[in-house]
Every structure is written in structure tokens, then in C-alpha cells.
């Protein structure tokens, strides 16, 4: 029997191909549960999950909440807007307070890179990173991988083009790490102003033209233009950005005929993607949302149940 040797899920970095495959296989089982009429199980009955979101989120928080409830856990959502953090309490103080309540898992989203890793050092329960600044978003990468694997039958040797605001995207970083670990060929397509320094060292091919970057791609993954994280003029205008880097039906023709179109959401229609593509036959954006619940069910079950069945490290995969 294969065991998952980690206590927390802080990032994709540090996960092996075997670890990733284990979680994806477990998520495949969760998909079956989610498609049943009776979706609730007793796997995590008696265990407590706290969702601690310091950044606004709709789909991710709802997905984690639904995942926990389908596994039978008691789920509590912490509203930061009404919390002691607004009164000056530090993240560490908050962590210590929550730890005293003896939860079994804390799910955290925070605007600062490293927040999840810091929390994991201060609490006695498992920690799941739901996105920390521009660092990582591991469950998003896992759900994207599950979506691709279910559609294409594999992850190895496929060509994935990640397009758009790579600089500010934790989704891009986690996907690059995961796809490389699984043997995919990864491309990034963006203007130079929206690419981090040293991006090529992450094992990707860099393109500044959509048509060139999408040529023969099996998967086209569009990223939102994250204007809320921009302090300067990274693009001349939204209109010009869409002209050169937006995905419409004509641009998509550069990819393979059966290429998947993906987007982590929320989408900016007419900014990075056209509605004709987002709602078109090659889009698997709705499937990504469905796979998100399954992946988070798999992560929760693995950390809270499987970890007690074999050797485990306290490595945080940061």
C-alpha cells in the first residue's frame, strides 16, 4: 500500500510524481461520490475543518466547504472582516487562538507568500494552502491536472500553454511545478512585463506570441489579468492586451483541434478570453470547478485519515 508521507499541503514543490498520482487517483474516487444522489460520507465524521480566508474568495472557499461537508466533517468558515485580525491581531496570534480550539485541519488563504507555511509551524493540526500571495495554489494545480488527465488520459508528454499574467499568478507557479513533475511540456505565453525574472529556469519554454505559443498545444490555460496586484502599468491598455494576448476562436486555431481550454477563474471576458471560447465545445472550465471539490475531498481525506496509516514526515512541501 502506498502512503502519503506529508502532514500539510503547502505547495506542489516537494511533492513527488508518486504523491501527485496518489492524490489524483484518490480524487477520481471522490468524483464518483460527488456524482451520486447521496453525496455525504462519514469519512471525517467527528473531525473539524476551519476555513480561514484573508482574501475574498467565492469558488475556492465554497469548494473547500463542500468538500469537508461531503466527507462528514464539521466545517467552520472564519470571516476575517469580523475577526480580531481587523483589530490588530497578528497571524501568529490568530493561529494560536485557533489551535487552542483543537481543529483537525486549517485551510488558509492569505495575501502574503509564506503565510501557510508560517501557520503550519505554529499549529498542531494539518494545514492546507488555499493560496498565499504570488507563491502557490496547490489544490488549483491538482484540480487542473485531474481535469486534463480525465480528458486526455495522461499528463506526460502533452503540451500545455499557460497564457497571460504569469508574473502575479500563484496558479501558474503551482501548475508549472506539477506539470513538470508529471512529464508534460510547459510553455508560458505573455508579454515580457508579465513574466517573472528567471522563468525559463523553471523548465518552461517562453513565448511572446499567442500563435507561436499555442502551436500544436494540447491544453491552453488562460490566466486572469490581476490588476489588483499591479502597482504600475504592466500593459498599455486592456484593449491592447486583449488584441495581442486574448484568446478568441481564431487564435485558438493555432492549438490542436482537440485542445482543451482552461481558466482558473474568475474570468474577465473580453480581457483574456472571449465568450465564444469560454463557452465553446473545447472549454472544460465547468469541469475544473467540479474537479475542485473532488481534489479537495481527496486532500482532506489523505491528510486526516491516510496519514495515520503509515510513516509520515512533517515536511511542509513549501
Curated annotation (Swiss-Prot):
The keyword Transmembrane does not apply. L-aspartate binds at residues 87, 170, 224. The keyword Transferase applies. Gene3D superfamilies: Aspartate/ornithine carbamoyltransferase. GO terms for cellular component: cytosol. Heterododecamer (2C3:3R2) of six catalytic PyrB chains organized as two trimers (C3), and six regulatory PyrI chains organized as three dimers (R2). NCBIfam families: asp_carb_tr (TIGR00670), PRK00856.1 (NF002032). This is Aspartate carbamoyltransferase catalytic subunit. It comes from Rhizobium johnstonii (strain DSM 114642 / LMG 32736 / 3841).
Amino acid at each position: 500500500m502506498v502512503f502519503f508521507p506529508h502532514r500539510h499541503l503547502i505547495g506542489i514543490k516537494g511533492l513527488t510524481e508518486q504523491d501527485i498520482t496518489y492524490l489524483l487517483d484518490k480524487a477520481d474516487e471522490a468524483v464518483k461520490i460527488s456524482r451520486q444522489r447521496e453525496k455525504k460520507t462519514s469519512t471525517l465524521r467527528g473531525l473539524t475543518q476551519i476555513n480561514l480566508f484573508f482574501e475574498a474568495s467565492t469558488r475556492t472557499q465554497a469548494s473547500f466547504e463542500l468538500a469537508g461537508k461531503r466527507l462528514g466533517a464539521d466545517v467552520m468558515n472564519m470571516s476575517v472582516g469580523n475577526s480580531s485580525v481587523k483589530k490588530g491581531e497578528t497571524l501568529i496570534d490568530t493561529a494560536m487562538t485557533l489551535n487552542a480550539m483543537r481543529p483537525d485541519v486549517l485551510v488558509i488563504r492569505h495575501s502574503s507568500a509564506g503565510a501557510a507555511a508560517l501557520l503550519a509551524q505554529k499549529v498542531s493540526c494539518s494545514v492546507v494552502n488555499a493560496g498565499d500571495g504570488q507563491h502557490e495554489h496547490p489544490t488549483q494545480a491538482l484540480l487542473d491536472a485531474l481535469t486534463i488527465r480525465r480528458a486526455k488520459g495522461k499528463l506526460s508528454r502533452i503540451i500545455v500553454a499557460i497564457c497571460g499574467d504569469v508574473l502575479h499568478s500563484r496558479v501558474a507557479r503551482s501548475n508549472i511545478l506539477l506539470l513538470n513533475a508529471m512529464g508534460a511540456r510547459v510553455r508560458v505565453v505573455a508579454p515580457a512585463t508579465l513574466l517573472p525574472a528567471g522563468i525559463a529556469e523553471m523548465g518552461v519554454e517562453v513565448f511572446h506570441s499567442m500563435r507561436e505559443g499555442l502551436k500544436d498545444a494540447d491544453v491552453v490555460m488562460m490566466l486572469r489579468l490581476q490588476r489588483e496586484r499591479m502597482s504600475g502599468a504592466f500593459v498599455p491598455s486592456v484593449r491592447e492586451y486583449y488584441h495581442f494576448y486574448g484568446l478568441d476562436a481564431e487564435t485558438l486555431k493555432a492549438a490542436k483541434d482537440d485542445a482543451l481550454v482552461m481558466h482558473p477563474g474568475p474570468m474577465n471576458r473580453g480581457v483574456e478570453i472571449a465568450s465564444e471560447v469560454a463557452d465553446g465545445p473545447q472549454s472544460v472550465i465547468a469541469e475544473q470547478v467540479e474537479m475542485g471539490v473532488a481534489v479537495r475531498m481527496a486532500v482532506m481525506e489523505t491528510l486526516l485519515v491516510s496519514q495515520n496509516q503509515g510513516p509520515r514526515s512533517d515536511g511542509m512541501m513549501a
